[in-house]
């Protein structure tokens, strides 16, 4: 159904909604995998695993050195989650964002407000969010221009964050 890769581990969502995990298990990101089924999406951070169940609740397991697990938002209605180096960001069904984990570059505290977001991606220590009008919000670490060099204007269809870079796909298929 879906696969996700962290720095040294991977997840796969099976057709029955259960999660398979393999790779490095330095912080329980593999061995902590919930046994139940009912998950609809998976994501990985550096040493963190994340999954959303059918109600929109987030499950997280693995590295908790910066609150990546213990500060995971509760409740339902989450439609997407993405993990970075030591932080995560989630998109709620109302189009708003929630971030948690390490905040040494503003990747949590600078999360933009609003309810017009449609897609997210956590990079190493920064995050990106695509708005319904095709514009991009970027926040967090900017050591390599991964935030400041974010293109202005609309026309974007997807965003992705790497450790020290960001990439965006335009609606016309160009990058």
Regions found by a protein language model. Name each.
Residues 9-12, 21, 48-51, 60, ...:
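Conserved core positions of repeat-based scaffolds
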Residues 8-9, 23-35, 62-74, 101-113, ...:
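Short glycine/serine- and acidic-residue-enriched loop/turn motifs that recur at repeat junctions
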Residues 1-2, 15-20, 37-41, 54-59, ...:
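Tandem repeat domain/solenoid detector
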Residues 6-8, 15, 26, 45-46, ...:
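Short loop/turn segments that connect beta-strands within the blades of beta-propeller domains
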